[in-house]
């Protein structure tokens, strides 16, 4: 377990991703460095009204403290009171073009230490894609990149983390997946630190290859008010998921995290309307019937 | 304790409020009646793209069941497994004009029964106002109507329920009140059923007088893109409160309530932007400095 090594990787990952996205967009991200009064801090990189990205944030944070609050360890009461350290990179990008999907990626590391005891640590992370208008080839490309990221660690990871992603990014109050999925994992600490770190690093390292080709392909497709309107409506689901179900968002907001960094994930313009659904057979209906179905995008086995 | 009497009152209240609002707006509400598979149902009255109201809903629901789930009674474990019955009217109105405030009102009744035991019951409710551009006279008018509603039940209620409202409608992650407050109460079952019912009824009955004069005064004020933009930004706070902190919304969504009726409270068009605050001294800044301060709008005592 080497925390400094993980932190260095995360700082570098954030820089590489922001630089890569700036090359695509042509507009620079704003960079805000902030301190956490209780220990640690972070850097939030934000783009708004870019050429391609309507709103997006790539956030790095590294927080630590002396006594882990009981609320943070409900599932592991034996960790209460331990010193802790957590670091991660988290991003959400909302392109302007309704044919380009929203994307989310996160890699994170947590460690709880106590003198005279073995440190307890785990990795978590993943990435998932949320289209407004679905393209089968985009979904396949994204899942292939997820699989490529995990394959070096072992055959078993992609199917397991793909399923975990479908289960996690699910709006129970809508009985609806958030998007076409990807991969998600948490509590990863087996078989050893090096294997877990390599796997997590590979997920972060594959992000640009997973997303940028899709963004490039869709960024300049012509669209009109109808598509923008549907995008704004569907973005409401993103808000609902993040504020009602996402554990990271809720924990951050309820535990005094930096609100503006946490809510960078929310879309720039959102609409709600009552009991609306798209006309059967329309391109909008196709999103529900063909894409928000938890299907397998890659041939299994 | 007479449940039928409460239910009749609530059905009538919904009708009176919807009729009153239709007279103001000139457009009819859509009325949807729905059943709850586990027992009960409701009527949702919705307006969208009205002449004055951009989006609004007035919801009546009456639900019952045989065994109260433990999750619903965390604070009162002795009620688990009892038969229960709950009814309420809940409304949120989002006017189009940014000078007209958003308003919320709710009155509700809950009863848990068991053969051979005294029924356990309580009332809850209140109303609160959320301006985008504040007007002192509107805040005073609204609070005066709240006080008028409670005064017949006793001097002590308005100050107590005003404070409770300020505490409840508070965005902890923003350190910011949702609006200029009003009144809020819950668990009301003293001194007796008749007193509690009268008080709750008076709150419901005062809603139109509390809000309609404000709406009429502001509905036709001239505004431009700047004011609409600030309104959309501030509406984001409404979404954040309702999805992150509001117990009724969260419980409804997480317990299989009717999603479209619960989320009628969300605004039609919402914007999020990073780390934004209004220029010092601007009309937008005045909202924060002069109105979102938990102040007393009526002379005390």
Swiss-Prot record, chains A, B:
Active site, UniProt feature: 104 (proton donor)
Important for dimerization (site feature) positions: 173
Annotated pathway: Porphyrin-containing compound metabolism; protoporphyrin-IX biosynthesis; protoporphyrinogen-IX from coproporphyrinogen-III (O2 route): step 1/1
Sorted UniProt keywords: Cytoplasm, Heme biosynthesis, Metal-binding, Oxidoreductase, Porphyrin biosynthesis
GO biological-process terms attached to the record: protoporphyrinogen IX biosynthetic process
Record-linked Gene3D superfamilies: Coproporphyrinogen III oxidase, aerobic
Catalyses which reaction(s): coproporphyrinogen III + O2 + 2 H(+) = protoporphyrinogen IX + 2 CO2 + 2 H2O
Any one GO CC term of the record: cytoplasm
Top-rank taxon, per record: Bacteria
Binding-site positions, a divalent metal cation: 94, 104, 143, 173
Family: Belongs to the aerobic coproporphyrinogen-III oxidase family.
Protein name as annotated: Oxygen-dependent coproporphyrinogen-III oxidase
